[in-house]
Amino acid sequence: MAQKERGEREERDNEFVDRLVHINRVAKVVKGGRRFGFAALVVVGDQKGRVGFGHGKAREVPEAVRKATESAKRGMIYVPLRSGRTLHHDLEGRHGAGRVLLRSASAGTGIIAGGPMRAIFEALGMQDVVAKSLGSSNPYNMVRATFDALKHQMHPRDIAAQRGIKYSTLQARRRHLVDVEG
């Protein structure tokens, strides 16, 4: 019975894509000198709209990455995607001195983002997005700012429900705006 459960757990792990974003060597100063350890930042996603990030620390790199991956799987969020490939609307996220701007993009644009943000979008399964990092370029701040923005992503049905209007009315207004701008 226990053997079968392990096999099932491994199958579930295979559905996730993990990306190592950053590794940092840290030192603890002790009487005899310095003790070195490693801190890892990992992004995990199922490429279907779920993504999470985690931070792990250990004396060896593989152990730090494993801890970060487990932490990322525990803290996953769901992000609704338009047509399974891009954002529904533009977003802004902040964390510390880090600020990111995320914009939805037309089909074929690709992922136009740097560093840690690209890893998040690839793990999320997003295909078209334009992202700009402003302020801090610290990977931890950029990842947390990107997640702050993604948490505020709303499906148009939810927006229509909040406004108390029909979804079809909201879609008609959107099409009208696209026709006027284009």
Curated annotation (Swiss-Prot):
With S4 and S12 plays an important role in translational accuracy. GO terms for cellular component: small ribosomal subunit. InterPro entries: Ribosomal_Su5_D2-typ_SF (IPR020568), Ribosomal_uS5 (IPR000851), Ribosomal_uS5_bac-type (IPR005712), Ribosomal_uS5_C (IPR005324), Ribosomal_uS5_N (IPR013810), Ribosomal_uS5_N_CS (IPR018192), Ribsml_uS5_D2-typ_fold_subgr (IPR014721). Belongs to the universal ribosomal protein uS5 family. Keywords: Ribonucleoprotein, Ribosomal protein, RNA-binding, rRNA-binding. The N-terminal domain interacts with the head of the 30S subunit; the C-terminal domain interacts with the body and contacts protein S4. The interaction surface between S4 and S5 is involved in control of translational fidelity. This is Small ribosomal subunit protein uS5. PANTHER family: MITOCHONDRIAL RIBOSOMAL PROTEIN S5. One of its GO terms (molecular function) is rRNA binding. It comes from Bartonella tribocorum (strain CIP 105476 / IBS 506).
